[in-house]
A protein has these predicted regions:
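Cytosolic, long alpha-helical scaffolding segments
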Residues: 1-206
Length: 206
């Protein structure tokens, strides 16, 4: 007997997820530029904040659309989980930018720039995977790449934390940079959480 599917007419969900993903790509590059040129490019903090607000707005639109759509293209709970995971990526990037100003940072260690580079790569892979959501194309290879980048991020943050304590920095400096390093790593972790949701969606609907 043929399998019956109720296919919704709207493609809005995919459009909104693409918007969220592209917003992350831009935000990640801005964060890398900020860290590479801090404090000269403090102006980028405000620009990152604008993109964080855009991320919140898209998340709100997705949640509203779930609530008013009778038949969603994929499970409504999965849509919500993916939207919030993507929003978390943006929130952590924004938090890092805020902390640079809040903590009065004068100089950025190379490990933080390395971490931001990992964020850029992870977000780019995530955007590729989001682009495959419509049609449920296999993204297993891309998701493996994101996991590999998360491992790389873990390695960098462990090395950065060890150096902070080893080099005898002022305790306040250690606390400041430990927070920033951890939030950069959380941004990558949120990419991996998003990837896990995407994997679940693919397995449920293929």
């Amino acid at each position: 007997m043929a399998k019956i599917r109720l296919i919704p007419q709207t493609r809005e969900f995919y459009t909104l997820f693409d918007r969220a993903a592209q917003n992350l790509v831009v935000t990640a590059q801005l964060l890398l530029d900020l860290l590479e040129h801090y404090p000269d490019r403090r102006d980028l903090v405000d620009e990152i904040k604008e993109h964080e607000h855009e991320g919140d707005a898209v998340t709100h639109e997705i949640v509203q659309l779930v609530n008013k759509t009778f038949v969603t293209p994929i499970d409504g709970e999965d849509i919500y989980d993916l939207a919030t995971a993507l929003d978390d990526v943006c929130d952590f990037m924004d938090q890092v930018a805020d902390e640079l100003n809040l903590y009065g940072v004068d100089e950025v260690p190379p490990e933080a720039i390395e971490q931001a580079g990992v964020v850029v790569k992870a977000v780019s892979k995530l955007a590729d995977a989001i682009g495959c959501l419509d049609g449920l194309k296999d993204v297993s290879g891309t998701l493996v790449d994101i996991h590999t980048l998360e491992d790389e991020g873990d390695r960098i943050v462990r090395g950065a934390t060890a150096r902070l304590f080893r080099d005898g920095h002022d305790p306040l400096v250690v606390i400041k940079w430990k927070d920033i390093h951890e939030d950069l790593e959380q941004a990558v972790d949120s990419c991996e959480r998003s990837a896990h949701v995407l994997e679940s969606i693919y397995l449920k609907n293929r």
